[in-house]
Every structure is written in C-alpha cells, then in structure tokens.
Amino acid sequence: MKLKYVFVWMVLLLSSISVYAQPKNTSHASQVWLAYFNQTRLSNKWGLWGDFQLRTREELVSDLSTGIARVGLTYFVDDNVRLTLGYGFINNYPANDNITVSQPEHRPWQQVQWFTKNKRTRLMQYIRLEERYRKRYLSNTELADSYSFNFRVRYNILYQIPLHPAGLVARKLSALINDEIHVNFGKQIVNNYFDQNRLFLGLNYAFDANNNLQFGYLNTFIQTAAGNQYRNINALRVAYLQNLDLRKGK
C-alpha cells in the first residue's frame, strides 16, 4: 500500500513540473499516438517482443511525426521478471513544412521489466537503455552520410487499478496511471541531459487475459537539444496490447 502512495505522489510531482513550471520558450502540439504491443512467450525461458507505433504531427490528424518498429528477444528470469535485447527502427518524418526529407534512426536497446501483482492491482516497471544512431541533416532537403550518437535511459512505471468490484477481470474497465522519464547521456549531449517526461492517464479494457485496449490522455514534455527550447505535446494515445503464450498446455 505504501508503494501505491509513493507512486501517486511521484506522478503528481512530475505532472506539476511539466505543466505548471514550463519555460517561456515552449511550443505546443496536439497529436494522436497509435500503437500495437506484443509479447509472445515461446518457452519457460524465452520469448519475443514486438511493438509498432505511429504518431501524428500536430492538430491531432495533420501529417505524421514518427513511425516506430521495434523487435526483441526476451529471457524470462521468472514469471514476473524479464530481460529483453532488441532493435528498433524509427522514422522521424519532417518536423515542419520547410523540411522535405525524413530522418531515420537505428536504436539497439536493452531492458529489464518486472511486475508486482496482487488480487486487485498491478504494477509494471521497466528500465530501458537505448543506443541512438540518428542520420544527420546536411540541409532541409538532404541527409548526411554520418550519424549522431547518444545513449538514453528510460524508466517507466505503470499502475493499474480496477474499476469493478471483481478486480482486474475480462470485459471490464480499469484505470491506468503511467509515467516515463527519459534521460540522455554521452559525449554529444551538451544541453539536454533531461530528454522528456511522458505522463499518461487512461483506461484499459480487457477483452480477455491476453488482449487489452488502452486509451487516454498523454502529456509529453520535451527539452530540445538546444537546451533552452521546449515542446509540450497533448495527445490522445490508443494502444492494443497482446500477450501470447505458446507453451504446451498453456
């Protein structure tokens, strides 16, 4: 129970920082984030990870900002702890009408994910390390042959609370409180060690034990590489989560 209150206070603190203490030099956007997440267990110890995402740029449905395809190989320490090694390809679409070429990114990643469950609630956390290789721009119309590189670490915590007396059961809604902070590091990082914070408040509908639909409000607060410029994104996030167990007898 104490962990629950610590989490709630942490979310409130991060929300206050991102919403009420925004610097003056902040741009704003409204977006839609769509995603599909899959975790497939192949055996007692091994499984696969896959997620695919698409995000609009502004005014909810105007143009695209980001496309993500990410895969990974997962090792199950036990039913509640998982280690994943993976690769992601990210396509950053032109950020404005003056840029005519997309910026590709190659992103190897490593992750430890763990779950804390009881009869009524569910807590998920992960720490992810990413190695980000992004194509440099020569101009608004041309990419360079070289890449910029930096590390990024992400900490994600999600708390799921049932809205039905029976608890977290199929064909019922539950509430979600989720926060993820991103921190940059590496030789090429000068001004923005803090990268971004994502606060999500939403609902989960469980079709069954393995298929869930999540939807709700996402606030993303980003510090750009310049260090003194920020971006605040208000988004509708919709995600389909599928967990498959291919072990015999499961």
Predicted features and spans:
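Bacterial Sec-dependent N-terminal signal peptides
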Residues: M1-T26, Y240
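Solvent-exposed loop/turn segments connecting transmembrane beta-strands
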Residues: P23-V32, T56-T66, K187-F194, A225-N232
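Residues that define the transmembrane beta-barrel architecture of outer-membrane proteins
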Residues: H28-V32, S65-G67, P104-P108, Y147-Y155, ...
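Residues on the lipid-exposed face of transmembrane beta-strands in outer-membrane beta-barrel proteins
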Residues: Y36-T40, V71-Y75, Q110-W114, L129, ...
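Short loop/turn motifs that connect adjacent beta-strands in outer-membrane beta-barrel proteins
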Residues: L42-K45, N80, K117-L123, L163-L173, ...
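Transmembrane beta-strands of outer-membrane beta-barrel proteins
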Residues: L48-G50, L83-L85, T121-I127, V153, ...
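Transmembrane beta-strands of outer-membrane beta-barrel pores
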Residues: F52-E58, Y87-Y93, T116-N118, L129-Y133, ...
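Outer-membrane beta-barrel transmembrane domain signature
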Residues: I127-N212, F221
